[in-house]
């Protein structure tokens, strides 16, 4: 079902077409997609390692910069198009309609029952840990480069923040839905808390 946010032209939809829906499997702790899990971490961790060791590995700033940007670009593509879909059943993308208007679409695979899960808990932990931790490190690198006046590295670090931050934002939107859904979730939560508190007060009195 499509839910369109009129404020920012985004859509929250069920994940993929019918032909991409695989048979539901029990949620297990084991890693079901080892290759995807490896490359989910490989490019982003490699970019961080090269950034930290670049002055020791090479005296050429251009070589280090190009290597880091290539790793960040490969990571952005792999996480956006492959690992999110396989590891956690999420995907985000953009499409332009017939009127030339751009729409952002955030997809999530809906599981039919609590017993039949398609997402491995181990893969989910790997996915979200890598997705959150690496952008945080790039933000730290950005402040470090700024305060140490390493201006030439600032552009590279900002590239890391932007590319990995974009994937983080996109997958958070896939996970929790649009701002409208967030508002309704918050309203529902506080409403339940208020009702529970009033019910408890009535029982004690």
Curated annotation (Swiss-Prot):
Membrane-topology descriptor: Multi-pass membrane protein
Entry keyword set: Acetylation, Membrane, Transmembrane, Transmembrane helix
Positions of region (Disordered): 1-21
Predominant place of localization: membrane
Sequence positions bearing N-acetylmethionine: 1
Residue ranges crossing the lipid bilayer per the database entry: 34-53, 54-72, 126-146, 152-172
InterPro entries according to UniProt: TVP23-like (IPR008564)
Similarity annotation: Belongs to the TVP23 family.
Name this polypeptide is given: Golgi apparatus membrane protein TVP23 homolog B
Gene: TVP23B
